[in-house]
Amino acid sequence: MAETDPKTVQDLTSVVQTLLQQMQDKFQTMSDQIIGRIDDMSSRIDDLEKNIADLMTQAGVEELEGENKIPATQKS
């Protein structure tokens, strides 16, 4: 290879740095979106758990014992 022009090296370095910064920004944006969606999903799951517990209470189902659901009317 012939001599490398310092200006060309500086230009290439600048382009690579810009590209890396753009990639980092995109990854950060995606990461923030994913975390936001996970937080939203967590809230929805909490709401679902509460709704299920409320429905079980309304249906007369008490706490689960082991893996079997025992309705309040069948408990001894």
From Swiss-Prot:
One cellular component term from this protein's GO annotations in UniProt: axon cytoplasm
Keyword DNA-binding: no
Record key words, sorted: Nucleus
Broad class of where this protein is predominantly found: nucleus
UniProt GO MF annotations: identical protein binding; transcription corepressor activity
Gene3D superfamilies assigned to the protein according to its UniProt record, in alphabetical order: 1.20.5.430
Subcellular location, record wording: Nucleus
Source taxon at top rank: Eukaryota
GO biological process: axonal transport of mitochondrion; cellular heat acclimation
Short name of any one Pfam family annotated for the protein: HSBP1
InterPro entries named in the record: HS1-bd
PANTHER family named among the record's database cross-references: HEAT SHOCK FACTOR BINDING PROTEIN 1, HEAT SHOCK FACTOR-BINDING PROTEIN 1
Stated role: Negative regulator of the heat shock response. Negatively affects HSF1 DNA-binding activity. May have a role in the suppression of the activation of the stress response during the aging process.
Known partners and oligomeric status: Homohexamer. Associates with heptad repeats of HSF1 trimers and probably also HSF1 monomers, and with HSP70. Association with HSF1 trimers and HSP70 coincides with attenuation of heat shock response and the conversion of HSF1 trimer to monomer.
Descriptive protein name: Heat shock factor-binding protein 1
Classification of source organism: Eukaryota, Metazoa, Chordata, Craniata, Vertebrata
Encoding gene (name): HSBP1
